[in-house]
Amino acid sequence: TLLCREDIEIKGKRIAIVGCGRVGRPLSMMFVQFGGVPTLCNSSTNKFRPDTMEKIVGECDILVTCTGIYDIVNVDWIKDETVVIDVGVQRINDKLTGEINREKLNERNIIATPSPGGVGPMTVAMLMNNLTLAWYKQQNIEIMNSNHCDHFRWATDERDELLEE
């Protein structure tokens, strides 16, 4: 839904996922369901070597980093207008940061989630959404089969209106 909020289409997009653990592997399956073409870069494959990763990252439309390693992807590898989803959060010099060098990233024409503060709050929101859907299902309450993007847009538009008041 982070991508839905920004009207970013997944279908047909080349997606590089750096890290194939508890976050990367399920994300790759989700992207396939939405018509994306993911490539996983994992430490157990040759796709994790810097020269190979540079090529994969340089060709992707959407980049997801979820390794827990700061500066795992050189910002110079990322082409302009790439969408970057920085999942990882770590502490460096008593400051929380993501995996991508934010200073270098901000100098480029790249769309990126904040980190920290981007994926984490969205994860909590989706957990609450799934909990609500599970409760409805348990109570045998039929709900509209709506597009997740439309539902999310409605919820965030309502929130934004409340914040403006």
Regions picked out by a protein language model, each given a short descriptive name:
Residues L3-D7, L133, Q138-H148:
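A charged, well-structured terminal subsegment
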Residues T1-W77, V83, T97, R102-E103:
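Glycine-rich phosphate/diphosphate-binding loop of Rossmann-like nucleotide-binding domains
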Residues I85-I141:
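Rossmann-fold NAD(P)-binding glycine/threonine-rich loop
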Residues E142-E165:
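Eukaryotic N-terminal low-complexity, Ser/Thr- and Lys/Arg-rich leader segments
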Residues C41, I100, R108, T156-R159:
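Intrinsic-disorder/low-complexity regions
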Residues M29-M30, I78, I85, G98, ...:
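Alpha-helix boundary/interfacial micro-motifs
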Residues S44-N46, T67-G68, R91-N93, A112-T113, ...:
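Short, surface-exposed, polar/charged, turn-prone segments marking secondary-structure boundaries
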